[in-house]
Amino acid sequence: MADPWQECMDYAVTLARQAGEIVREALKNEMNIMIKSSPADLVTATDEKVEKMLISSIKEKYPSHSFIGEESVAAGEKSVLTDNPTWIIDPIDGTTNFVHGFPFVAVSIGFVVNKGMEFGVVYSCMEDKMYTGRKGRGAFCDGQKLQVSPQKDVTNSLLVTELGSSRTPETVRIILSNMERLLCIPIHGIRGVGTAALNMCFVAAGVADAFYEMGIHCWDMAGAGIIVTEAGGVLMDITGGPFDLMSRRVIASSNKALGERIAKEIQIIPLQRDDED
């Protein structure tokens, strides 16, 4: 049977490359930077331009499909996940990196049907690396098959996370104390490149053993989530329970045992879900 979504995925790859060109071009020019929810939650005219290009191009080709986009939500649209084929888009994952010219910026496109991830495309713009994952077909970076690490021992693990954009003292305190508890297990280390999508792709590629974060959104995870699972990894809630795309929290791990061990150390930050008003 023909794969009904392969054409959509091929189109997503083409669009992600086009978006990457816009991002690289914009880096040469003066930026117009705006602030969203906190002084560290930034958006630029390029975020908005890229999202507009992606959504209008997809709408033209697939008018019956639904969309959740980071900048559309910031502008007041709702994040409602239905059973309809839905494109979940982060036009620039790593906007703060983009603003500073720090070389990790990604375009993330996730495609969800019946609330399940069908494919994901994450394009690392400055590195010119294309990560893809297709349900039942594996995960790849520029055509090379990805496989998570075999690491089950937390004391030999390298984790990836982010400090997030909240600057509320209590939230910052919890984030830092979670890192402290994990480091003192002890583990090999904690890294982070400033984009959840690429951090998750590093788990898929086997160069990091697990990623965890609270406070991120469905558009940060929808592209890379299926890349992790198709590379043999697991997604779970930060509590160790089942993963929920709209919950704003995730552990992406090379295996279940490692993910559950990390979950034991983490204090939860209470967050409003993406699908709550």
UniProtKB/Swiss-Prot annotation:
Belongs to the inositol monophosphatase superfamily. The modification Phosphothreonine is found at T168. Its cofactor is Mg(2+). It holds the Pfam family Inositol_P. Its EC number is 3.1.3.25, 3.1.3.94. The gene is IMPA1. It catalyses: a myo-inositol phosphate + H2O = myo-inositol + phosphate; 1D-myo-inositol 1-phosphate + H2O = myo-inositol + phosphate; 1D-myo-inositol 2-phosphate + H2O = myo-inositol + phosphate; 1D-myo-inositol 3-phosphate + H2O = myo-inositol + phosphate. Substrate binds at E70, I92, D93, G94, T95, G194, T195, A196, E213, D220. Homodimer. Mg(2+) 2 binds at D90, D93, D220. Phosphatase involved in the dephosphorylation of myo-inositol monophosphate to generate myo-inositol. Is also able to dephosphorylate scyllo-inositol-phosphate, myo-inositol 1,4-diphosphate, scyllo-inositol-1,3-diphosphate and scyllo-inositol-1,4-diphosphate. Also dephosphorylates in vitro other sugar-phosphates including D-galactose-1-phosphate, glucose-1-phosphate, glucose-6-phosphate, fructose-1-phosphate, beta-glycerophosphate and 2'-AMP. GO terms for biological process: inositol biosynthetic process; inositol metabolic process; phosphatidylinositol phosphate biosynthetic process; signal transduction. Its main location: cytoplasm. Keywords: Cytoplasm, Hydrolase, Lithium, Magnesium, Metal-binding, Phosphoprotein. Mg(2+) 1 binds at E70, D90, I92. InterPro entries: IMPase, Inositol_monoP_metal-BS, Inositol_monoPase_Li-sen, Inositol_monophosphatase-like, Inositol_monophosphatase_CS. This is Inositol monophosphatase 1.
